[in-house]
């Protein structure tokens, strides 16, 4: 499901139900009020939610005594996407004031097939686990800016041959299904009597994703970074027709527009790649005698997306999370946490989303 428009982690306010429209003014005043008055906007249609039925799965597990009682698992699932993609219909009449005749809506693709195999066990006191999964028809959303340009009948999108203008009222499915594989390997362990704590719990996991048959289609990359260079020619600062971020966007001044174009128009990075990988680390100390009937657990976790772009990894993205958890008699818990996003991901939508939180839980 989508975060609400205007909420902290929503990077595209046109996306959620009841939000929008997409402001499509090409120059001058690009405020919502002006776009509504001039018709230079694309309205949002109703969401197309998946059916309640049609989701099921099967898992088989076996203990392998010859491998120190390791557990082998085989599983299959058929499920519907929880992540929205966006379909649309191109404008039905020519002229800027008829941009409003286009439309878009969120969809949740159904019947995603998942095959998996897992193996977990203990090696020298350390719990280790691995998993290989394969989705032959995983839906991947096209780049949002490319989709919007198709809705406005631009002759320069990846969905038509170079120079070919989409037909009036042409529909577009905002995603394509691709074979997607993932392999992950991890381990957990505990060490007693560390830094005055009763125990130190450690966890590490690394994973790699592969998208087959990617071709020239462009998936992912935050819409805030504008359009990248297409096949019709490179960015020329003296030719506004080559700009991938139009003058007047978001009421930015010409200098800011020029800087955005210089940084993005010749840059085809940020879209999903064939391969991507990263890892996650976590450490937690448990103190059982600091406070009466209370376990105090400070912890730290670290994220690093090392290489490539995909549904789970964004190259160069890093994050650190710190937390302090108080658990009283397993009935009450209070946690203070802080999360910091940073790194060298040039297409991040997270680096300005650092946050602190307080959580109180009661079990009964």
Language model segments and positions:
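Outer-membrane beta-barrel "beta-signal"
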Residues: 352-364
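Short loop/turn motifs that connect adjacent beta-strands in outer-membrane beta-barrel proteins
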Residues: 63-71, 192-202, 288-297, 329-331
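Transmembrane beta-strands of outer-membrane beta-barrel proteins
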Residues: 1, 61, 73-77, 131-133, ...
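Membrane-embedded beta-strand positions in outer-membrane beta-barrel channels/transporters
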Residues: 46, 57-59, 71, 116, ...
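Beta-propeller domains
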Residues: 39, 43-44, 48-149, 155
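Transmembrane beta-strands of outer-membrane beta-barrel pores
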Residues: 64, 76-82, 123-125, 134-138, ...
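Short sequence motifs at beta-strands and strand-loop junctions characteristic
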Residues: 48-52, 109-113, 120, 175-182, ...
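Solvent-exposed loop segments that connect transmembrane elements
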Residues: 2-44, 84-104, 142-173, 215-268, ...
């Amino acid at each position: 499901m989508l975060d609400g428009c205007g909420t902290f982690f929503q990077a595209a306010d046109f996306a959620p139900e009841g939000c929008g429209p997409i402001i499509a003014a090409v120059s001058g005043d690009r405020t919502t009020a002006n776009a509504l008055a001039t018709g230079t906007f694309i309205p949002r249609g109703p969401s197309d939610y998946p059916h309640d039925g049609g989701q099921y799965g099967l898992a088989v597990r076996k203990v392998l005594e010859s491998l120190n009682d390791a557990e082998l698992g085989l599983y299959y699932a058929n499920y519907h996407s929880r992540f929205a993609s966006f379909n649309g219909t191109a404008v039905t009449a020519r002229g800027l004031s008829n941009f409003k005749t286009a439309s878009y809506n969120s969809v949740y693709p159904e019947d995603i097939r998942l095959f998996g195999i897992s193996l977990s066990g203990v090696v020298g006191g350390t719990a280790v686990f691995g998993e290989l999964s394969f989705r032959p028809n995983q839906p991947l959303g096209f780049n949002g800016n490319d989709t919007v340009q198709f809705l406005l009948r631009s002759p320069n999108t990846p969905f038509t041959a170079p120079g070919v203008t989409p037909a009036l009222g042409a529909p577009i499915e905002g995603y394509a299904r691709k074979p997607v594989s993932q392999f992950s390997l991890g381990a957990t362990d505990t060490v007693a009597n560390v830094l005055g704590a009763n125990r130190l719990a450690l966890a590490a996991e690394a994973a790699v994703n592969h998208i087959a048959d990617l071709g020239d289609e462009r998936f992912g990359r935050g819409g805030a970074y504008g359009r990248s260079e297409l096949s019709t020619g490179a960015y020329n600062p003296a030719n506004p027709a080559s700009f991938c971020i139009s003058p007047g966007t978001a009421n930015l001044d010409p200098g800011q527009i020029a800087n955005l174009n210089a940084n993005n128009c010749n840059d085809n990075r940020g879209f999903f790649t064939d391969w991507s990988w990263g890892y996650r680390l976590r450490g937690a100390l448990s103190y059982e005698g600091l406070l009466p009937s209370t376990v105090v657990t400070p912890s730290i976790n670290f994220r690093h997306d090392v290489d490539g772009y995909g549904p789970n990894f964004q190259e160069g993205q890093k994050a650190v999370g710190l937390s302090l958890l108080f658990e009283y008699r397993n009935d009450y818990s209070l946690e203070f946490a802080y999360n910091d996003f940073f790194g060298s991901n040039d297409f991040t939508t997270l680096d300005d989303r650092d946050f602190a939180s307080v959580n109180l839980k009661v079990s009964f």
